[in-house]
């Protein structure tokens, strides 16, 4: 059940080689370019160089699923076969963009594949697949509990041959990035509809549209996640053509449900890679540092921590692969239980793993000298992103209880 296809295994070997030759040796250079940049949200020259090399190596758009094989050169991958590749990429927080496999663009590209018109695909999907532009998904709002997607208040009103948007969004990933050109915006177009799930629509808004105001970059645990950033945005009388609606009026919630499930899985895949690398670094540290006359690796408490980390990573990986297998064989709608279990379990486990590995590194584990502090921030962020743990646990608990209610 858990043996990956030969195509996936071959890609994993090539991807690991690329990481060894191009990514790990450039981690310090990337950090230096980012710190030296006059504009932290501008594209970095090193990133563009690495993207060209990844394209030439045939390691591009690896996220594209089998059913959309026409959009990639590798023939598409199942969730199960993509998992080990995303795990490898997750070992360096910024490197998924090198392979055009970064959030939220992967999810947004799948939205365009599944729900956009041919004209919308030509205008936005094609340059996204080429890596020429980036995108944002504007859903979360500061004034309401956006974990309930039906709460969104941004208004979408029809005025002649245009949609007019007014509202307030925040934590919109990618929106600060200069290369981001298109926002997928969710809001209420029919607030009086008796069905709460038919009140929303999703509208395509070019970022340079008059009335789109980037208020500020937001931080998570002090990280601004440059150069992509998480923005607070105000939409003030933003006007776009009627053709900029996705799928149709009242279909916004449907699109959100179709988009967010796979995105949650991708985050968990990458997090396992971050946890695995943290464990490896902790083991190297334990074998090289001495306290009280003994290597750290000789201390019982360190061995216990390493044991817990190993076990929790294995648990997380197996849970993820079972969820991937169910998605591949039964589809996303039938797999919401496993997606919820994965989404609520893996970020929490990874956060614990990285915390122990940081502790083994002493004060250095808290610094930018190692990847763990940023990875910890990513894991903690994932417990809120795409819906907080509690919402998914509530829905999953109800689903499990209902199975045994009759």
Positions of the model-derived regions?
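Short glycine/proline-enriched turns and hinge-like loops at secondary-structure junctions
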Residues: 77, 147-150, 175-180, 195-198, ...
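Flexible, small-/acidic-enriched active-site or ligand-binding loops
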Residues: 151, 210-239
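Short, conserved phosphate-binding/catalytic loop or strand-edge motifs used
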Residues: 102-109
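A short, Trp-centered hydrophobic/proline-enriched beta-strand micro-motif
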Residues: 131-140, 185
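Flexible, glycine-rich active-site loops centered on histidine and acidic residues
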Residues: 109-115, 192
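Cytochrome P450 core scaffold surrounding the K-helix E-X-X-R motif
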Residues: 73, 146, 214, 244-249
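A short core secondary-structure module
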Residues: 161-162, 166-215
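Alpha-helical interface subdomain recognition
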Residues: 1-95, 102, 115-120, 127-132, ...
